[in-house]
Amino acid sequence: IDLIGEQAQANTLGYSWGFLTANLLGGMRGLFTVVQQYLYLYMPLLTMSLMSREYSSGSIKLLYASPVTSTHIILGKFLSMMLYGLVLMGVLFVMVLFGGCVIDNFGWGEALSGLLGLYLLLCAYAAIGLFVSSLTSYQVVAGIGTLVILAALNYLNQVGQSYEFVRDITYWLCISGRSGEMIAGLICSEDVIYFAVVVAMFLSLAILRLNS
């Protein structure tokens, strides 16, 4: 709302409304950017009890005794987080839809690209949190562990910036940079593959943990 007010004030003073969609969604204080910045703080609270609660309550024994495999258990937990992510994206889409109704020449491509980037980021966070939650029966430990990993992946691109080789590696591994490109309106197959690899890797680790 503040950004819309600033843009309206600038328009009143005779300045251009240029790149309004980019400013409102992907700018430094844009909607998608703010969601991206705080998502890694919020996701550990959602994922910390996915498996650790099963351990602490003893219900994991019932799951082992039921006719389901470890793969089914992990994929079922992950599917619930994917559905939650769709609900969150639906809420954001309502805001985007409102912007499309009130803004002339709204950048739908950029908006949908940003939603895709946030959804893939949420799925990656969920897979990481699910894996960490499978390592311990203590929910707080799982939450803190997930937060540490997500924070490291978000700020990894700030490490070793004075060395070109290290800078290239940390940039490639930094998860926020991948979603940031999509929020900016650029969908690259490399970024999509990156998220797919992260999700597959941590889900596989979680399945191996249950099988051990």
Q: What do these predicted ranges mean?
A:
Residues 2-26, 135, 142-209:
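Terminal transmembrane helical anchor/hairpin motif
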Residues 27-53:
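Long, hydrophobic alpha-helical segments
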